[in-house]
Swiss-Prot record:
Pfam families (alphabetical): Toxin_20 (PF08089)
Species annotation: Cyriopagopus schmidti
Lineage of the organism: Eukaryota, Metazoa, Ecdysozoa, Arthropoda, Chelicerata
Summary of subunit composition and partner proteins: Form 1 and form 2 may dimerize.
A GO-annotated cellular component: host cell postsynaptic membrane
Cellular location(s): Secreted
Function: Lethal neurotoxin that blocks neuromuscular transmission. Acts cooperatively to potentiate the activity of huwentoxin-I.
Tissue-wise expression: Expressed by the venom gland.
Record bears the keyword Iron-sulfur: no
Protein name: U1-theraphotoxin-Hs1b
């Protein structure tokens, strides 16, 4: 399993916009983890 983004706050680095980690096809985010759909 892979971690998804927690909150925007934790993803921010300095003045860069936050980027949310996406799950790939066939997976979805659930409880901050990528799970099979």
């Amino acid at each position: 399993l892979f971690e998804c983004s927690f909150s925007c706050e934790q993803e921010k680095e300095g003045d860069k916009p936050c980027k949310k980690k996406k799950c790939k096809g066939g997976w979805k985010c659930k409880f901050n983890m990528c799970v099979k759909v």
